[in-house]
Amino acid sequence: SRYDATYINGIEMNDPTRGRFNYWSIGGLNRAFRNKTTILGMDATPFGFARIGSSTNINTLAADFAPGFNGSISYSNGAYMLRAMATYATGVNKHGWAFVGSISGRYAKEGIMPGSFYNALGLMLGAQKVFNPQHSLALTFYMAPMQSAGGSPTFKECYELADNYLYNPNWGWQD
């Protein structure tokens, strides 16, 4: 809500127009953006100004990821048909460097509704140089481009006339 603030590595990422965080901007990157700290209400936060609702900081610092590989492939019959994710983190090496990379893809030629497709990619890269326990320098890059088509709400009468509860009023001839 507009009473909440979402930060990524201590930088507020709420949309300045709507006042809300756009979760589609990190779509598919669940593993890369799962490390969070949430403060409820007006309590002091170590990462930004408190909000009436809550303040959440998403930590994508490479040194804070557990070293190793994590991957998954899943099939669904919903908005998308196939999803693949992979994340790899090096941990902090003897020179004080840590790296992390995450990629995901979601695809459907046609989702559960006729005329709906889904094509999304997510990519996150992070590097961090740890100088000592109190000082480090980090760079995080992420993107999540997406194309999709879906249905829209309609009246029960339309579903009954089409004799199909998956009727998509956005698909077909539009006169």
Regions inferred by a protein language model and the residue ranges of each:
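Short acidic-glycine motifs
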Residues: 1, 45-49, 61-65, 98-100, ...
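Short acidic/polar hinge/loop motifs at secondary-structure boundaries
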Residues: 12-40, 59-61
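Transmembrane beta-barrel wall of Gram-negative outer-membrane proteins
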Residues: 70, 75-108, 112-152, 171
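Solvent-exposed loop segments that connect transmembrane elements
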Residues: 151-174
